Every structure is written in C-alpha cells, then in structure tokens.
Amino acid sequence: MSTIVDMVDVSLVDKCCWICKESCDVVRNYCKCRGDNKIVHKECLEEWINTDTVKNKSCAICETPYNVKQQYKKLTKWRCYRRDCHDSLLVNLPLCLIVGGISTYTLVSVEIIKLMESEETSELTKVFLVTSFLGPFIVTVLSALRTCIDCRTYFLTTRKRNTIHTLQELEDDDDDDDDDDDDDDEEYADAVEEIIIGPSN
C-alpha cells in the first residue's frame, strides 16, 4: 500500500504523459485523478477515446466521465468500412433491380395485354398472367424496403464511426465538501492498485 500512496503523492517535477510516455509540461483538468495519472497530452487522450475499442468515455481509474464534445467529420472525409456494409445490402439491391426490371417488362408487354383483352383467353390463363406479375412485383417491393432499411443502417453506422470526440477540461466544482477527501483518497488508491497490480483474490 505504501507504493500506491507514493504513486498518488508523486511529485510533478518529471511530468510524463501516461499514454505516450513523453514529456508533458502542462497538466490539465480532464478528470479527478491526481499525481502522474493526471498527466496526459490532450492529443493522446483524444486519440485514445476516439478508438473503436474504447466504449466508455470516462477515466479508467477515477471513473469520471470525460467532458467531450461530439462532432461529425465532413461527409467528403468519411471513411467507409466494408465490415459495416450488411451482406443483405449487396444481395437485395441487385435483386431489386433485376426483379423490378422483369416486373416492368411483364407489365408493359404488348403480348400479355393482348392476351388479357382477348376473349379467347381462358380465365385460368388470365389468373396465371396476373399471378406471374404480382409475384415479382411483391418481391420487388419487399426487396426495395429491405434495401432502404439496410442503407439507413449502413449510413448511421458509418456516421457513428466517423464521429470525433473533442476533449475539454472539467469545470471547477467549488461546492465539494472537504469532509469526504479521506474517503475519496482511499477509493482512489484502491482503484490505482487494482489497475496496476490487479484485482485481489
């Protein structure tokens, strides 16, 4: 425990970013950590919280939510990820075009119209012709609907992946009570110990 206390009360003479391990001359208030765990470059921390693997935008030690501002990249600078594209989008779009073309051709076919208007055409033949048109038409409508849903999902997923979180400092809270400082220090030391040493059995 003495090691943890020394780490919490570490001097800021040799300031070093805890992410890149490079020199850091300015200590900003991004969370409620103290000591060397508070020393970090803004660029390093922003790059860290913008990675896909980081889902929780809060400090891993003190669990303080970062003050981040969400922005979207310009549409011309979006990066599209192939894994975000749903497989059905690649299947439904060509299917919609192919079946739609067949349905359109069937609808405007002169020969079919003539057969439908002919008195010699049996009722069974007319039913078959109507069914042969309605079948592809229904498939076309369903495929188009599914394609629209997949396109919307792909757009929202791509937009989320092209989101930039800009980091800002926390606002000073002058209303905190000094009576809870001892408890906060103890919880903070336990959190640092668990991250560095590992959870106790």
Curated annotation (Swiss-Prot):
Region annotation Disordered: where it falls in the sequence: 168-188
Reaction(s) catalysed by this chain's protein: S-ubiquitinyl-[E2 ubiquitin-conjugating enzyme]-L-cysteine + [acceptor protein]-L-lysine = [E2 ubiquitin-conjugating enzyme]-L-cysteine + N(6)-ubiquitinyl-[acceptor protein]-L-lysine
GO biological process: symbiont-mediated perturbation of host ubiquitin-like protein modification; symbiont-mediated suppression of host antigen processing and presentation of peptide antigen via MHC class I
Main localization, broad class: host cell
Top-level EC class as recorded in UniProt: transferase
Similarity annotation: Belongs to the poxviridae LAP protein family.
Protein name stated in the entry: E3 ubiquitin-protein ligase LAP
Native source species: Rabbit fibroma virus (strain Kasza)
Lineage of producing organism: Viruses, Varidnaviria, Bamfordvirae, Nucleocytoviricota, Pokkesviricetes
